[in-house]
A protein has these predicted regions:
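Absolute protein N-terminus
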Residues: 1-2, 63
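Amphipathic alpha-helical segments
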Residues: 2-14
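C-terminal structural segments of small proteins and small subunits
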Residues: 8, 30-36, 40-63
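Major-groove DNA-recognition helix of helix-turn-helix-type DNA-binding domains
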Residues: 13, 17-29
Length: 63
């Protein structure tokens, strides 16, 4: 899955960007705890399976 698709998915779930440093973007949600960090040098980069699982876990999203 591409980075832009993941970002679109979590933004539709209510996550919004709170800070960015380089290629790392951090998102926060109004009701869910914690932060979601997405590191992608290009929006067209394919993210590794372990990275995707970590993002889904952080965002509390079922696959």
């Amino acid at each position: 899955m591409k980075a832009r698709d993941i970002i679109k998915m979590i933004e539709e779930d209510g996550w919004y960007i709170v800070r960015q440093k380089g290629s790392h973007k951090q998102y926060k949600h109004k009701t869910k705890k914690g932060l979601v960090t997405i590191a992608a040098h290009k929006m067209s980069d394919e993210l590794a399976l372990g990275t995707l699982n970590s993002i889904f876990k952080q965002a509390q999203i079922k696959k």
